[in-house]
Amino acid sequence: MSRVLPGKSVNQTNRTKFLVELIKPSHYDDDGYLIQWWRGFVPSSSLSNLYGLALDAQSRNILGEDVDLDIEAHDETNKNLPVAGIIRRFKRNANRGIVLLVGVQTNQFARAVDIARELRAAGIPVAIGGFHVSGCLAMLPETPPEMKDALALGITLFAGEAEHRLDELLRAAFENRLPPVYNFMADLPGMEGGPLPFLPMKYVKRYAGALGCFDAGRGCPFSCSFCTIINVQGRKSRYRSANDIEQLVRAHAAQGVKSFFITDDNFARNKNWEAILDRIIELKRRDRLKINIIMQVDTMCHKIPHFVEKSVRAGCKKVFIGLENINPDSLKGASKGQNRITEYRKMLQAWKKAKVLTYAGYILGFPSDTPASIERDIAIIQRELPIDIMEFFMLTPLPGSKDHQEMYLRGERMEVDTNKYDAEHATADHPRMSAAEWQDIYQRAWHLYYSPSHIETLIKRAVASGMRSRRMTSMIFYFYGSHAFEHVHPLQGGILRRKPRTQRRPGYKRENPLSFFVRRTRETLTTYLPGLWFFHRLERLRKKIENDPASKHYMDVALSPVVDGEYDADLELYHASDSAVRAADQARARAEEMRKIEVRRAAAG
């Protein structure tokens, strides 16, 4: 069986063609326009996985020796989706084929159904899969209204993972017997030795930096109440082998892809992490492959022997860390007890010492949060934690999470518009903030963290740590600029916004071409001129700091080495709340107990 088959499909005139259109939908902004770019920033792991599975099915002639799969992929975040063209292709092929809307998150579900509605009106078979469908069917006692509406249109809903199941779906579509629902949530497939994720270069180049992606594993052992991963992918670690990863990397490298985003929710808890990193290190050494990696990890990864070191040797230049909050009560309430604030400084300094740029996700809206406490916590982070890039999220009860399930069962108010479940909108009531206050502090949090003085501090820390200052400023521009100028979250960001006039959300008036052109021109100028000026000032500041010899010796509280007994020091991180004081006391007690154990061992030795 072919594991990765990036070659051309065979299409001869005497053979039957079966169309497979893979679509990763975008979602709508607050004005009803699609969020779409000339180049996207974040690649779709689901699209890569489904394309690889479809290639494997193609190589095995699953529909018969005389039937060819004609596979096309579309990521709507970086490409105008040719719905009319797809309909024409299917019409020319007597509607033989299927459109699969893949990896559909809750905020993308409304757009996915809008696409499917047009296709179903033309008689084209359509299936929707992804976290929204899987999460709802896994956690809710009944099908939610938006999914019932999809079923009424004749759309097939697919819950679970497509490995070992795509063959059946394609055969059912080929034989015109698609059921309303596939539900494989009770049977999560193994990953080792299976078909591998792949996207041809013509698709990969639509992402900034030609960034490829793959999941080295799925599942997470933790139990965060706001997370959907554990209920959709399970808590048991499933992973690819080192041989799988080598074949995957080689296939991508053959077409010029050298940068990868490992999309595991927590690569540090992938039980095969060391073998995978060792193999990548060997590929870099033996085959001279230039490989760069971005990965996601937890706040305790630095305590895993050799994890940071081998990540760096494998090419890790940037790492995303689920910091979430610095209030232990908030972390405990979200069942995120694995995050210990007393380990934050050690963990961040371990990555800083390794010259790896850190991104930290921070959630606003835990029950104890107020605008004042959020402002205070951001100031503490700026002063005492050597985080590089911060990105903020509003606490959101995502379907598939325990939070959503419990709120649903209690009958609590939640936003009915799935398009707003993007972690940028208030989708539930907060006990201490109004929706307006919550929304306001979310907007201000970005400006508070990326203040002019702290941007200067971030660049100074980068230079003092031996990091590339240009990497720091480019990430500041991308993350802060996405919010400040494009008004979207960086994870939905990209280069040069497209805003197709004709693809506005149903219910919004389609603008007159002339008035749209005038407004869009004004909007473009007021977005990119300030953005370019900000970039100019960033570059000027970067060069100034680079050229200052004193910058290499810069030191502040965040960079100061962690020392024994620092829990008693004047660090507000450990004194900002009663729960922070308790966390420091517990860390102090653990350290003392470890000291006593070492003393006893030395005495016995």
Enumerate the language-model features and the residues they cover.
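Acidic, low-complexity intrinsically disordered segments
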Residues: 2-255
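Radical SAM enzyme core and accessory elements
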Residues: 1-22, 91-96, 115-121, 425-605
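Structural recognition of alpha->loop->beta junctions
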Residues: 142-167, 310-318, 376-392
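Short acidic (Asp/Glu) and glycine-rich catalytic loops that position anionic groups and cofactors
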Residues: 29-31, 225-228, 254-260, 356, ...
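Flexible glycine/acidic-rich beta-alpha junction loops that bind and position SAM and/or redox cofactors
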Residues: 29-30, 133-139, 165-166, 222, ...
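Short helix-capping segments at alpha-helix termini
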Residues: 61-64, 119-124, 283-290, 354-355, ...
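Radical SAM [4Fe-4S] cluster-binding motif and immediate context
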Residues: 192-359, 364-366, 370-372, 376-379
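Conserved beta-strand positions
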Residues: 22, 101, 128, 262-264, ...
